[in-house]
């Protein structure tokens, strides 16, 4: 895969660093280097993004990692690795930011589950707006939450796929829900994907946890 033209839209360097390190943990340095080469990201071999919140990790780079995982490991294997990378990014980088940092406080812990989500999901969306160029909105419905990404880094530049591909975002969302809820797992399903031709990437979160 050749290098894609840069988007000019960015995630913080730290998000890129954690994504790359989480993949190295699973597949080893040689496996990671193969993914980086395949995605046109050889400049990150032995030269990871810096550990800071500067906007320096281009959306095309995250998209290239996702598509390279699929290409090398197949849709199922790539999906699992991308979900893991997304979860790791939340656990290592995001849960201590802003309103999310208060999720372990007693005053928050004793709130009813849906109240936690009403506070936590918009707070999570706001963090992306503050730290990155990702634009996210949240809408509450009767039995579900709708999490919408209007400029999506996970599938930036991709077209012509027949199924949603934004598994890094799915993993981020799953782990954020687990953190905010105090340990529950929720069903998260990507229902729309820009790479499929949809105008946005949309994720449906069932309000009732599965565990």
Regions found by a protein language model. Give the residues of each.
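N-terminal low-complexity or simple alpha-helical regulatory segments
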Residues: 2-84, 89-92
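Amphipathic interaction/junction segments at domain boundaries or subunit interfaces
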Residues: 54-165, 178, 192
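Short alpha-helical "patches" and their helix-cap loops
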Residues: 31-42, 79-85, 106-111, 182-195
């Amino acid at each position: 895969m050749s290098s894609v033209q840069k988007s000019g839209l960015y995630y913080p360097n730290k998000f890129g660093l954690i994504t790359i390190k989480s993949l190295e943990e699973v597949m080893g340095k040689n496996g990671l280097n193969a993914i980086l080469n395949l995605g046109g990201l050889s400049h990150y071999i032995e030269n990871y993004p810096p550990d800071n919140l500067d906007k320096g990790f281009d959306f095309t780079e995250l998209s290239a990692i996702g598509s390279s995982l699929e290409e090398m490991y197949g849709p199922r294997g790539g999906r699992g690795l991308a979900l893991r990378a997304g979860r790791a990014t939340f656990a290592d980088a995001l849960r201590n930011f802003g309103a999310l940092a208060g999720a372990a406080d007693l005053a928050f812990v004793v709130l009813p589950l849906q109240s936690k989500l009403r506070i936590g999901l918009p707070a999570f969306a706001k963090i992306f707006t503050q730290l990155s160029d990702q634009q996210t909105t949240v809408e509450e419905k009767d039995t579900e939450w709708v999490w919408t990404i209007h400029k999506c880094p996970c599938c930036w530049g991709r077209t012509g796929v027949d199924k949603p591909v934004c598994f890094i975002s799915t993993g981020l969302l799953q782990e954020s829900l687990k953190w905010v809820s105090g340990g529950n797992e929720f069903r998260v399903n990507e229902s729309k994907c820009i790479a499929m031709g949809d105008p946005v990437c949309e994720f449906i979160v069932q309000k009732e946890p599965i565990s």
